[in-house]
Amino acid sequence: TEVPFTINKANLTIAAENMNTNVNSVVPAYKFTSLGLVGDDTLDTIFSCEYTKDSDVGTYVITPTDCTFTSDVKNNYNIEYVNGTLSVYGSSYNKASKTVKIYSNHDTDVDCYVVSYAENGTLDGIKKEHCSLKADEISTIDISSLNIAENDSIKIFLWDNNLTPVEITN
């Protein structure tokens, strides 16, 4: 006598891990966690993210888009993908709007000095701005008063309450 039976698919959750990097850094190797793999099944995940080495400070969604198994078992799973967040810390300069954005991973009060250099490397101008940085919030500083020329370069220095200068640009 035959007895009918049904084998249900296992539920599998693949979650992109939240990650941090600094502005102007190479794209990190995204990581994931999985919950629900059965037996010796293993997998690898493919991600998409808008972040590139030239991206601005801020947050970007890390999206797991697909997965591959070491054996042909993908059809045995109901797969749910969970996005993660890439936080890009540091500072960036927007030439068009003449603003500097600073994205910090901790709360702190700082004095921000934006120093501009002419194309030949001579000092062109300095602007000081006091900032109360909040963790994971973007602060924007208007530096249009520096009259930065197209080929000038800038460096941004932060001085915290301990008077420790930190250069946060290349």
Labelled PLM ranges:
Residues 1-91, 106-107, 118, 131:
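Solvent-exposed beta-strand/loop surfaces, strongest in extracytoplasmic domains of secreted
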Residues 28, 96-100:
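Structural beta-strand segments of beta-rich domains
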Residues 53-56, 145-150:
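Surface-exposed, short loops/turns at beta-strand junctions within beta-sandwich domains
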Residues 99-101, 137-146:
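Exposed aromatic-hydrophobic patches
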Residues 111-117, 155-157:
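Beta-strand signatures of extracellular beta-sandwich domains
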Residues 124-135:
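Solvent-exposed serine/threonine-rich low-complexity stretches and specific carbohydrate-binding patches
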Residues 148-160:
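Short, surface-exposed ligand- or partner-binding patches at beta-edge/loop junctions that are enriched
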Residues 160-168:
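Short acidic/polar inter-strand loop motif in beta-rich domains
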